[in-house]
Design a protein with these regions (language model features):
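Pre-Walker A (pre-P-loop) alpha-helix and adjacent loop at the N terminus of AAA/AAA+ ATPase modules
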Residues: 2-50, 98-106
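Eukaryote-biased feature marking scaffold/signaling PDZ-domain proteins and nuclear chromatin regulators
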Residues: 11, 40-42, 54, 117, ...
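Short alpha-helical
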Residues: 22, 53, 88, 149-150
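Conserved RecA-like P-loop NTPase ATPase core
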Residues: 16, 27, 47, 56-59, ...
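Short glycine-rich substrate-engagement loop in P-loop NTPases that contacts/grips substrate
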Residues: 21-24, 75-112
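Walker A/P-loop
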Residues: 35-80, 131
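Beta-strand-rich binding-surface signature
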Residues: 44, 113, 138
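Conserved catalytic/switch belt of AAA+ P-loop NTPases
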Residues: 33, 98-106, 116-154
Length: 155
């Protein structure tokens, strides 16, 4: 029998059901700025799990939540959503990211926010290129995947 209840997309991070308490705590630490990002060569958050678990919904909430935790202000410049298509190449990804990072951010933190949805659809070369972009201190990257085993180990 089908559930006739309407689907309600989460509106806040508190609406997300996490797979384990450690994941929730990690996200809460990042959002509250207890764990700073970017810091010490870390500028990315990887969200993974099976289809329909809310990875993309959470990814869309995180940039504003992180900005509020850092500056108590909402985003002035919206995050960049990069929906990866099968075979998306390294030069395509890097050209887009570099073009955005070359501009000044008008967010109070000075950071750019990127959501790279279905990052496992990138070619291996594109994933390797992305690793170099993740070394920036001028951006926060939120990556989502259903297939963590298909990602370059450096991501």
């Amino acid at each position: 029998m089908f559930n006739k209840e309407p689907f309600h997309e989460p509106q806040t991070i508190n609406d997300i059901i996490f797979g384990n308490p450690e994941s929730r705590l990690r996200i809460e630490d990042i959002v509250s700025n207890t764990e700073t990002i970017p810091s010490c060569g870390k500028s990315a958050i990887l969200l993974y799990g099976v289809f329909g678990t809310g990875k993309t919904s959470l990814a869309k909430m995180l940039p504003n939540a992180i900005e509020q935790g850092k500056t108590s202000e909402d985003l002035s410049l919206p995050e960049e959503m990069i929906a990866c298509q099968q075979g998306f190449s390294g030069p395509q990804v890097m050209t887009l990211i570099e073009a955005i990072l070359s501009r000044s951010s008008i967010n109070a933190s000075g950071l750019h926010y990127f959501i790279i949805d279905e990052v496992d659809n990138l070619t291996k070369l594109a994933q390797q290129s992305l690793k170099s972009a993740l070394n920036t201190t001028r951006g926060v990257f939120i990556l989502t995947t259903n297939n963590v085993s298909q990602l370059d180990k450096g991501l």
